[in-house]
Amino acid sequence: MSTPTPPSSGRPKQPFPSSPGSSRRSKILGILVAIIAIAIFIVPVVVSTYTDFAWFRSVDYQGVFMNVIVTRLVLFVVFGLIGALISWLAAFLAYRARPDEIESLGTSSPLAEYRPLIRRNMRPFLVGIPLFVGVITGMIVQSNWRSVLLFLNGSNFGVHDPQFDKDLGFYAFNLPFLQMLVSTFSVLLILAFVINGIGHYLLGSITTGNPRVGEKASISTNARRQLAVIAGVWMLLKAVGYWFDRYGLLTRSHETFTGASYTDINAVLPAQIVLLVISIFVAAMFFVTIVLRDLRIPALAVALMVGSSLTVGLAWPAMLEQFSVNPNRAEKEREYIARNIEATRYAYGIGDDKVTYDRDWGASGDAASKEQKKAVADDSATLSNVRLLDPEVLTPTFTQQQQLRNFYGFPDELAIDRYEVDGKMRDFVVAARELNPNTLDGNQNDWINRHTVYTHGNGFVAAPSRKVDEVARDVGSARGGYPVYTVADLQSMQSGKQGGELKLDVKQPRIYFGPVIASSNQNNSDYAIVGNTEGEPLEYDTDASNYTYTGTGGVDVSNYFNRLMFSAHFESMNMLLTDRIGEGSKILYERDPRERVHKVAPWLTTDSKTYPIVIDGRVKWVVDGYTTLNNLPYSERIGLTDSTADAINPDGVSETQVVDNEVGYIRNSVKAVVDAYDGSVDLYAFDEADPVLKAWRGAFPGVVKPRSEISKELEDHLRYPEDMFKVQRELIAKYHVSDPGVFFQNDSFWSVPTDPTAPQDRQDNAQPPYYVVAADPETNKPSFQLITPFRGLRREFLAAHMSVGSDPDNYGKINVRVLPTGTQTLGPNQAQDTMMSSDEIARERTLLKGTNDLTNGNLLTLPVGDGQILYVEPVYSQRSGQDSAFPKLLRVLVSYNGQVGYAPTIAEALDQVGIKTSSTTDIQEIDGSVVDPTKDGGSGNKGDKGKDADKDKKSKDEQSSDAKGAAGKSDDKGTDTAPEQRVRDAMDKVNKTRESGTFEEFGKALDELDKAVQDLQSER
């Protein structure tokens, strides 16, 4: 039944009164919306802030957290209020200047009928818009907290720029902050102009008029004055911006160099002064409009500004560039290129005080002469330390032989460090045996097991890089070619065999922190809950025992509130409900050493590599920290991600670990040490003269310890960092040139060679630098170095060789051996091609490829003797198609003076290229009798046997007779079939003719071997 409609009374309808029930529902709905908003926006912030503070307190760096939080909060509040106040004033003044009589505004405007409604509802706009602008302003400015702290704590460099004679500290610390202020207030004034103008239009102070009904556009006096003041102040800020832009010219990038060019100094710089004056004039014209009603005055001034910008700012510099500079660029830019060279060398630590150039190195002497070969053979500092173990290749070998359990593992790339053995420096391939969360299997992945049982790794593993357990003359044998391990872990502690030849004394071998343990492929699962003292130990330690963490690191979760907060942080309800958390329980997270360092020192860029060392009876991680600046006058800017990419690390340093990806200044100012057991972080000032580090130490007092606190034991294990070296080598490839004219021509530049031994998909990437022990360029004594070759620009011939010392007495000394111009010394790719095209090598690789996977190790470019280059490359083999197979050292390739050596040992390979080294005993890679490295408690420790290696080793003939044929196959009785015997006989003949026969005899022997292998394969 329909309800009759009441007759209209002509009066406006009144709204229905709301019922008490609907009002209650509205309140409940409002409360629910508020709760949801709090849960979505507020709770995550509270949880994140609380857990972050708890983490910083657990590592005793809460001062860093509070300093950053307070700085950001103050910036947010101050600039948020400023932004809100400016926008509020713009809106309020427009509202206050509204016309009193709306009717007088006319009715033709589309806003005419809405203006009464707008006037009655201005309060939300007067509050909402300023609040929004203030929040956005505060958020943007607080993200620049680093610039603010540097401005407040920066000091002088003691070096001045060549154009304005200002200390570099002005550009590093003051200019970025001042430019941030100018840009912030410029944007706020633009917003204020827009808000004020729209407000006047909406409220009727500005009308557009309607010619069809005879209404003219109009602007009230108050509106004109307010907009003129805002525009005038903005123009004054524009003038200030032009003043600061002058300094920005010194960091401009050009095709050939960085910094102000001839055109910049002689055209752009004067133009900016002219535009600065015009900006002040335009501002004055806007202010004049406050008194005069004629808007044509500021309009003409703005037209003058635009015209001047086009003519003086653009046309004049372009004409000067085209008609004066381009025809004579080499001479015109000479002074400015010289500035660029000097500034770049200073900014990257590659000046004459840091780099020594050995010009025309190797110019005298013939590499084939007896004198040169003797000089090379006598270079025992290099030849007795040739590294045969490639840390990039041997991770599977370390894993198979030293893993112990499926949940342990090693990083994809092992590390190189040096230790003293019997009074001599030796380099070792080193790694910590970490827990690998990605190899947990089956029920091991249960939440209880993953986070409370499998919590830590076990031990430190090292292998001398220059030798293996036994010569692998027979590729088919299970013997030989494997590292000789020195292990310090729980098992070796219990057996009393810890340390081996390194005499390591590790009192705490458990690894709770490391890059592998933090590499979980499950999101938000990098944590372990440890330390529960209630009941029996829960953490897996050995097959016979469990363990309870007793370290000082970690955040207490024994109380329910912390459990609740971390349960929310890691989105894990199990943390709330489990009974595995009790008295003394702690949660360990942020377990990657690099991430820990970056978190406690957020102003540091961290190196992409970290490596374990053993000092003070504990395993610790060393992380290199860099202080950087985005730019510096005349210094070339370089991208850290691109410049640190190579064949091993094609992605370069992670952007999450950098403060500035594009930098114009860098110093390795901090060495950080992270304890692998308790996660404690110690930062040491390594370059105390660095002005940027001084500023950060002022901002965070007490965070970085003085260099004097670096112990002798730690100093002996510090390495020159790879990423720093990569950046420097990319720049030295250009900036070794001192003459601006030659620099402009580009024909004397070098380039980093690509890696010929990399996998096919990475062979276009740069060859990585390598750590080696070799003869020091100055003293000729063994020193731990980082080395890299250079090739000519767009040429493959070797142009130079760069090395840097890492020992305490020569740390950071860069030596560049520059080959004479015009020489044709083979570069790395040419040497690789020469070695791979050798008939003997090609034949053997062809024979082996059917059953074995061959891997070329790192190609080392080693300066030897009095100016000669020796290439050394290990070759590894592993069985094809077998998941359990892992690489072993099979052969050693060498290239010297165009000759190729290929043998099971470095001594034999050197002998084949005519180097009769007196260091044969030192570099012999036999270590006595063979021991299965997977036995002896899993440690594979053979260090004690290694001491008597020279006494116990077999002769080459004995090794050869013990070895099985390269393609032979033994049955259970040790007898061979006829084809197999023919292969053995052919192999013997190849070996004999290689040592004493002619090339013709050697070729025939290879043919016989090839036929014997084919017969064997046919029979099978």
Curated annotation (Swiss-Prot):
Residues 1-23, 924-998 are annotated as: Disordered. The lineage of its organism: Bacteria, Bacillati, Actinomycetota, Actinomycetes, Mycobacteriales. Keywords: Cell membrane, Membrane, Transmembrane, Transmembrane helix. This is UPF0182 protein jk1603. The keyword Metal-binding does not apply. HAMAP family: UPF0182. Its main location: membrane. Belongs to the UPF0182 family. PANTHER family: UPF0182 PROTEIN SLL1060. It comes from Corynebacterium jeikeium (strain K411). It is a multi-pass membrane protein. NCBIfam families: PRK00068.1. The keyword Endoplasmic reticulum does not apply. Pfam families: UPF0182 (PF03699). GO terms for cellular component: extracellular region; plasma membrane. The chain crosses the membrane at residues 28-48, 73-93, 125-145, 175-195, 227-247, 272-292, 300-320. Residues 942-961, 969-998 have a biased composition (Basic and acidic residues). Residues 1-18 have a biased composition (Pro residues). It is found in: Cell membrane.
